[in-house]
Amino acid sequence: MRPSNRTPAQTRPITITRQFTAHAEGSVLVEFGETKVLCTASFTEGVPRFLKGQGQGWVTAEYGMLPRSTHSRMDREAARGKQSGRTQEIQRLIGRALRACVDMKALGENTIVIDCDVIQADGGTRTASITGACVALVDALNWARGKGIIKSNPLKFLIAAVSVGIYKGEAISDLEYIEDSAAETDMNVVMTETGKIIEIQGTAEGEPFSHEELLELLALAKNSIREIVDVQKAALN
C-alpha cells in the first residue's frame, strides 16, 4: 500500500494554471499533488553567439528551488555563489526535453528561456517542471505568432514527464518524496504526446532491476504521460 493510498498506476492530482504571472510571454503554475512549480517562458529576439547567422532559434532552461520549498530551509544557490551539480543536471534535462519538441528553423533567430522555480517540493520536481514548461512554451510561441515575430508554429508536439519507480517491490507511478527517498529503483521518463521516448533517467537506488521490470516501468510511464498530456490539452483549450 502506498502512503497516499493511491493505486500503483495512479498519479497525484495534477493541475495546470496558465497565465499565472503578468509579465512573462508564457507562465504556468503546475501542481503534482503537493509539488508546485512556477514555469515561465521568456521570448527574446536573437540567439547565442554560436547560432548567429544560421537561421535557427534556441530553447534553454534554468531551474531552482526556493529556500523553503523543502522541509527545512536551504540557502539560495546565488548566496552560495554556485549552482549544485543537481541543479545543473536538471536544467539541462529540461532544456534538452523542450528542444526536442520545437522546430528550431521555424523559430527563426529567436530564443526562449524557460525558468522553473520550485515553490514546494514533494518529489518529482523535474518531471513537473518539464510538464508545466511545455505549456508555458506553447503560450510563448503563440504570443510570438500573434505579434508577427514568427510566421509558422514551431511546436512539433507536446511533451510531458513522470517519475516511476519500484517501491517495496512494486512498480509505481508519480512518486512523492516519501516514496522517492525509499525507492529501490527511481526513474524519470520524458515522452511525446504519442508515447515516443525523449529521455529516460533510471537508477537502481537499492536493488538492481530486471529487463522485465524496466519494461513494466516504461509501460507505467507511458500510460501516466498519456493522462498528463490530457491535462495539458485541457489547460490549453
Swiss-Prot record:
Catalytic activity as recorded in UniProt: tRNA(n+1) + phosphate = tRNA(n) + a ribonucleoside 5'-diphosphate
Binding site for phosphate: 86, 124-126
InterPro entries the record matches: ExoRNase_PH_dom1 (IPR001247), ExoRNase_PH_dom2 (IPR015847), ExoRNase_PH_dom2_sf (IPR036345), PNPase/RNase_PH_dom_sf (IPR027408), Ribosomal_Su5_D2-typ_SF (IPR020568), RNase_PH (IPR050080), RNase_PH_bac-type (IPR002381), RNase_PH_CS (IPR018336)
CDD domains according to UniProt: RNase_PH_bact (cd11362)
Family annotation (PROSITE patterns): RIBONUCLEASE_PH (PS01277)
Enzyme class: transferase
EC number(s) recorded for this UniProt protein: 2.7.7.56
One GO-annotated biological process of the protein: rRNA processing
Gene Ontology molecular function terms on file: 3'-5'-RNA exonuclease activity; tRNA binding; tRNA nucleotidyltransferase activity
Any matching Pfam family: RNase_PH
Domain of life: Bacteria
The family this protein is said to belong to: Belongs to the RNase PH family.
Function in brief: Phosphorolytic 3'-5' exoribonuclease that plays an important role in tRNA 3'-end maturation. Removes nucleotide residues following the 3'-CCA terminus of tRNAs; can also add nucleotides to the ends of RNA molecules by using nucleoside diphosphates as substrates, but this may not be physiologically important. Probably plays a role in initiation of 16S rRNA degradation (leading to ribosome degradation) during starvation.
Quaternary structure and partners: Homohexameric ring arranged as a trimer of dimers.
Protein name: Ribonuclease PH
